[in-house]
Amino acid sequence: MRVVITGATGNVGTSVVERLASDDTVTEVVGVARRGTDWSPPKTCWITADVAVDDLEPVFRDADAVIHLAGAFQPTHRPLATWRNNVLGSMRVFDAVASAGVPVLVHASSVGAYSPRADGERVDESWPTNALPTAAYGRVKSYVERVLDTFERDHAGVRVVRLRPGFIFKRSSTEAQRRLFVGPLLPNGTAAAGPDPGGAGPSRPASAGAAPVGRRRCVPPGSHPRRARRVQRRR
């Protein structure tokens, strides 16, 4: 089984890559990220690409599943930037999944997509996903849910799985989460519980490289390449 993961060097993406790389039923993991990485888990190829710009169909071709984790929580004060990354990027991923004939699409939405409930009671997955009108991130995720509704209607042969998690934290990404949520409000070192995801290793993206295979570069186990090749940009 060949699985492609967008946002593969992110907080969640690195854990997914690590898990799939250890799964005997998975023959190849293709990690897609805007920046490369020195991390080289088994059976993993890295492709440097921006989902909002680059041509994704060649990357998704022959994949058994695409797991779409790429997105941006910040900058909330620049809604056009988050719209580009979360909405336009997701739309291009969905289109490429359809064009490449991928049978399974897993999309990471957010608990923020759910509509508020006045009485504060718990809800299940059938609850409307119209978001809180004043929450910028939730509005974006809600819009993508509507796009995905249309995708499911038009591509009945594709199995679509939607994830709506809350915040996901792990020890190795402490420093990156500190920068994301509190920035300069928390002094450096106060939350230093693990390595920065900006380096190498699980949850630590950096720069990459490897043996070339077509338009991508694969990372053989134990190698330490310098830079992954970018995919061709659509003109």
Specify the residue positions occupied by each region the protein language model found.
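NAD(P)-dependent short-chain dehydrogenase/reductase
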Residues: 151-209
